[in-house]
């Protein structure tokens, strides 16, 4: 008999068929309590769980006593209670490699669009403000040869450094938990403490996961150390930044602009002050959102779940220590 799994995300037909070759699949729209109650028997017998964006906590795990592996269609997993998974020896799989290049493209797009005010001036054209040759009030700032500060030199940070170094001749500063020899050798990146980076960088790009240590890592004190001409980019997780402090820094001119793909609350409330600031480019968490990459992420998540339930945790496993 095939193992049973819960699928809480729509998949392309070919990937759904691949799952069905290996498992008995119960599809549900979400993991809300009423959905779990409606499909109680399926949840109680499920050995696998696959989807994205929903919260997986102790309350849900209590309804899934046979669960052996969960696979998320994402690189981030802050919506999972990892301690609760570990306590129950449930493997957690994610997709850290397939989205690297696409997310780095998005970060570079934020750098360019904020510096050159692409979104702002495009809207001015659309509403009929381009009635004569443009003047300095339409000008942006250069990107090439400006100093890029990367906070978090993981796979995405490395891919961003490659684009900045070779494409725009940008000197690279970085701060991370440890030195990154590849970044230093390939892109002449220079490791420095966070304060030094904040004071020297023209662009500060935050690419960090959300953990207890990184929550509100960036607040008023950090923005105060940045140049008044600096542009801040966040493409990691929203709660790494104290959004109230960011808004204050933007409104006061303490920093020049911000390009944001993530927020403390998502979707971003329509009354957020960020949406009324012309020096903010706000995206709806589209870092990996291309047709190609989202398909590849889903395919990776499917393969991850198949591997996990076969006891293969050599790659893409958050907590391999719980494997039996």
Curated annotation (Swiss-Prot):
- Which InterPro entries does the UniProt record give? D-isomer_2-hydroxyacid_DH, D-isomer_2_OHA_DH_cat_dom, D-isomer_DH_CS, D-isomer_DH_NAD-bd, Glyo/OHPyrv_Rdtase_B, NAD(P)-bd_dom_sf
Q: Does the keyword Oxidoreductase apply?
A: yes
Q: Spell out the molecular function terms from Gene Ontology.
A: glyoxylate reductase (NADPH) activity; hydroxypyruvate reductase (NADH) activity; hydroxypyruvate reductase (NADPH) activity; NAD binding
What enzyme category does the UniProt record give?
oxidoreductase
Similarity field:
Belongs to the D-isomer specific 2-hydroxyacid dehydrogenase family. GhrB subfamily.
Its annotated function is as follows: Catalyzes the NADPH-dependent reduction of glyoxylate and hydroxypyruvate into glycolate and glycerate, respectively.
Q: What is this protein called?
A: Glyoxylate/hydroxypyruvate reductase B
């Amino acid at each position: 008999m095939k193992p049973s799994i819960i699928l809480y995300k729509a998949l392309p037909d070919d990937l759904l068929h691949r799952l069905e070759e290996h498992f008995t699949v119960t599809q549900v729209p979400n993991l809300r309590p009423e959905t779990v109650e409606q499909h109680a028997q399926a949840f109680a017998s499920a050995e696998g769980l696959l989807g994205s964006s929903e919260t997986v906590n102790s309350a849900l795990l209590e309804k899934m006593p046979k669960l052996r592996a969960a696979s998320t269609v994402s690189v981030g997993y802050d919506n999972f209670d990892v301690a609760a998974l570990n306590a129950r020896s449930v493997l957690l799989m994610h997709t850290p490699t397939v989205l690297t290049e696409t997310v780095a493209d998005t970060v570079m797009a934020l750098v360019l669009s904020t510096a050159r005010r692409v979104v702002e001036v495009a809207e001015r054209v659309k509403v009929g403000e381009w009635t004569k040759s443009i003047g300095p009030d339409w000008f942006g700032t250069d990107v090439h040869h400006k100093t890029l500060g990367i906070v978090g030199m993981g796979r995405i940070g490395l891919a961003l450094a490659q684009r900045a170094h070779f494409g725009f001749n940008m000197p690279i500063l970085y701060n991370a938990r440890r030195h990154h020899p590849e970044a230093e050798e390939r892109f002449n990146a220079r490791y420095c403490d966070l304060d030094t980076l904040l004071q020297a960088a023209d662009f500060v790009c935050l690419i960090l996961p959300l953990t207890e240590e990184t929550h509100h890592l960036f607040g008023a004190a950090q923005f105060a150390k940045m140049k008044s001409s600096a542009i801040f980019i966040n493409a990691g997780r929203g709660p790494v930044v104290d959004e109230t402090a960011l808004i204050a820094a933007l409104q006061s001119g303490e920093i020049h602009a911000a390009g944001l793909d993530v927020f403390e609350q998502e979707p971003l409330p329509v009354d957020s002050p960020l949406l009324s600031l012309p020096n903010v480019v706000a995206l709806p968490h589209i870092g990996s959102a291309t047709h190609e990459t989202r398909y590849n992420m889903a395919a990776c998540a499917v393969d991850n779940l198949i591997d996990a339930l076969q006891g293969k945790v050599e790659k893409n496993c958050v907590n391999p220590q719980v494997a039996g």
